[in-house]
Amino acid sequence: PLGVELQATGENAGTWGTKTNTNLSLISQLFGGFNSQSIAGGAQTTALTIVDGNTTGTAQHRMIEFTGTITGNQIVTIPLDVETFYILRNSTSGAYTVQFKYVSGSGGTVTFSATDKGDKLVVAKANDGTNPDIVDISFGLSSIVSDTSPQLGGNLDTNSFMIDFDDAHGIRDENGNEQLIFETTGS
């Protein structure tokens, strides 16, 4: 279902090497390939493809980046029999949603909100021939660097590492009251 063309015994005499090389290229593409897919324009559906025995399919890559200026909500689809995981990047401009789903059915989908211009790790499960699911498995992690108020759900274990503070910074309580302030020393 991801485009690799299986060879039967005695098949493709004289072209076996070429077809095998194409299959190896497909496998390489599936494990780490990158596709920059323009979805520019108004509200529309863009169908990503799988091409058996060929490396030209737009859904036959591990990472797919959506690009272009969008002026309406976008839907990007994959064929029903695809079962893999993707790293998706929304690099579009324009405040519209981008939905990633199977070509038909009412199974689960993954949608980038109008302001979400980030990455998602998704699994295309092909778990139902009529209504298969696509699931976001990003574990809620986005850019930790841009999170100005990260929160822990438990104790912080530094695993024998240090926590470094800038000069005149430290630990405050929930009301902003300073509890520990650290100063940089000369040694």
Annotate each predicted stretch with a short phrase:
Residues 1-2, 10-98, 132, 162:
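Exposed extracellular interaction/assembly regions and N-terminal maturation sites
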Residues 7:
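Catalytic-domain carbohydrate-binding cleft regions of carbohydrate-active enzymes
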Residues 17-19, 116-126:
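Extracellular disulfide-bonded cysteine-rich modules/repeats
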Residues 24-34, 94-102, 121-140, 181-182, ...:
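Short, surface-exposed terminal/edge motifs of secreted or surface/virion proteins that either
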Residues 28, 33, 140-186:
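Register-specific beta-strand positions within repetitive beta-rich fiber domains
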Residues 68, 102-104, 173:
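Short acidic, glycine-rich loop/turn motifs
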Residues 81-83, 115-119, 168:
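Tight coil/turn sites that cap or link beta-strands
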Residues 105-114:
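Short, aromatic/His-centered strand-loop micro-motif at the edge of beta-sheets
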